[in-house]
Amino acid sequence: NCYHTYYPFFPGLSERNWTDEWLDAKNLEESEPKNFGDKEYTLYEAKQKQRQMELAMRAQREKVRLLQKGKADPDEILLHKAKYQGQLNEYSRFCRKMKLTEERERIYLDMKGRVATNSKRQNALFPREMIENASKDVAQYKRYKEVLGDYIGSLVNFGQMKYNDSEKWKIIS
């Protein structure tokens, strides 16, 4: 994660690349915090957050691939793809706001191609809260499906009911 470059320096022979004034200005610029959401980040903290986001997206890509290999419920796969798409969008917003270069090659290390949902229509099937809480909501859906059977409907219907139809949700929960 270090972005330093080292060169041999021989006192009396070598010339410095940067003046003390330039280095002081650069240090001041890099230590200036920027806001994203409800948190402030210095350049170093922003780069750490960027790496954390990339790691989370690689994990989500792997989860989608494993669900596909395991022939999971298509709605569950779609929900996790939508979560991945949301992570990508958040990553782009974060990098723009922090003036960082997006390093998507760090996300695509698995060389497995496209994982995100294909359209906004697919993303719109699930409420935003459900996309954020994908794993918990899928587990909850499976428990309800075990008890209530087909009455609970599909994962898409479950999400719509839980987050958008409070009357029906009160009845079943």
Regions from the PLM with identified roles:
Residues N1-S173:
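Activation/maturation switch segments at domain boundaries
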